[in-house]
A protein has these predicted regions:
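Gram-negative bacterial Sec-dependent N-terminal signal peptides
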Residues: 1-27
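A residue-level marker of the well-folded mature domains of exported/periplasmic proteins
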Residues: 3, 23-347
């Protein structure tokens, strides 16, 4: 059934141009399966809504699973999606290596795979993400502007997610000169298992204890880990210590308005979700990865060459909070909740 539907879609796309109308025509009766790594994180709700909206607009169907932070469950989830007869897969990998058998299974069934936001280090998966090295640079730049000298802590992402190291590389690019000059000392550094805020908080607490609270800045790799770091700092009366993040989670944007987080690099997941849906449908219709608009060849650290598309992030600080309100990402009320005499638009 899967292969028959894919062949039908290919036949349709062969006779149509790459317009939105043709994309909608080719998507009739197609189903895209999405495997989420951990849908409990706030961020993925927005991604899902964008994917659903794009699929529905094209006349395609959406089904999904949640691996609940389990690599083993993600493999069985993908098996389940394939058994349901999906025509393409979008996979947010829990573990970039452990998910490879799922890509093999998809290939065995003639199904295209979009590696969503996180690298799946396999040339058979199209890699769609933001420029995560640049995200790391943006995080470090914002914190460095606030604290040009002092003791830094690096709260990294999950050790099973290549994005954690991409981010860390970008952060180090920005900080290296100050480190070499002796202006900055990195007094603590830790990965955050599963990107879980509770793990980030525990790591931050341990570093604060080891350093007798002599910490001037925290470069945290996403808003969840930032939230954990802020909780640990607040418990020690250190709220207001510069902390970075990414994803523009509503709670993080509120922390920026309150002054307890310095920056959240906004990766508009509405754009990412829409792109993922459109790419999945195009690939299901027989389009080559190389023909995807904006696609480029990219080589991973392991030496694999993949087709990838990188979207551009935006750093959000107290200086430009209006941008997320103007874009409809967050309401002014949600942004400014509990804020008095804060930055615009909360003043």
């Amino acid at each position: 059934m899967v292969k028959i539907k894919s062949l039908m879609a290919a036949a349709v796309v062969a006779g149509l141009s790459g317009t939105a109308m043709s994309q909608g025509a080719m998507a009739q009766d197609l189903t895209v399966g999405v495997s989420w790594s951990n849908f409990q994180e706030e961020r993925w709700k927005t991604d899902e809504a964008a994917i659903k909206e794009a699929l529905e607009a094209a006349g395609a169907a959406y089904v999904s699973t949640d691996a609940q932070s389990s690599s083993a469950k993600q493999l069985s989830d993908v098996e389940s999606l394939i058994a349901q007869g999906v025509d393409a897969l979008i996979i947010l990998a829990q573990d970039s290596q452990a998910v490879i058998p799922a890509v093999q299974l998809a290939a065995d069934n003639g199904l295209p795979v979009v590696g969503y936001d996180r690298l799946i280090d396999d040339p058979r998966a199209f890699y769609l993400t933001f420029d995560n090295v640049e995200v790391g640079r943006m995080q470090a730049r914002a914190v460095l502007a606030e604290v040009p000298e002092g003791n830094y802590v690096m709260i990294k992402g999950s050790p099973t997610d290549p994005n954690a190291d991409f981010l860390r590389a970008g952060q180090q690019e920005v900080l290296q000169e100050a480190v070499d000059a002796g202006k900055i000392t990195i007094v603590g550094e830790a990965y955050t298992d599963g990107w879980l805020p509770a793990n980030a908080q525990r790591n931050m607490e341990q570093i604060l204890t080891a350093e007798d609270n002599a910490v001037d800045a925290v470069v945290a790799s996403n808003d969840g880990t930032a939230g954990g770091a802020v909780a640990a700092l607040t418990a020690q009366g250190m709220d207001g210590t510069p902390v970075s993040g990414q994803d523009a989670d509503h709670a993080a944007l509120n922390r920026i308005a309150q002054g307890t987080q310095t920056v959240s690099v906004w990766k508009d997941s509405r754009d990412l979700g829409r792109e993922a849906a459109e790419i999945a449908l195009a690939l299901a219709g027989g389009e080559e990865m190389s023909a995807i608009e904006g696609a480029e060849e990219w080589t991973s650290a392991s030496g694999n060459t993949l087709w990838a598309k990188f979207l551009k992030p935006v750093p959000v600080t107290a200086e430009n909070l209006e941008v997320v309100v103007d874009a409809g990402w967050i309401s002014k009320d949600a942004l400014c909740q509990g804020v008095s005499a804060g930055p615009a638009p909360c003043n």
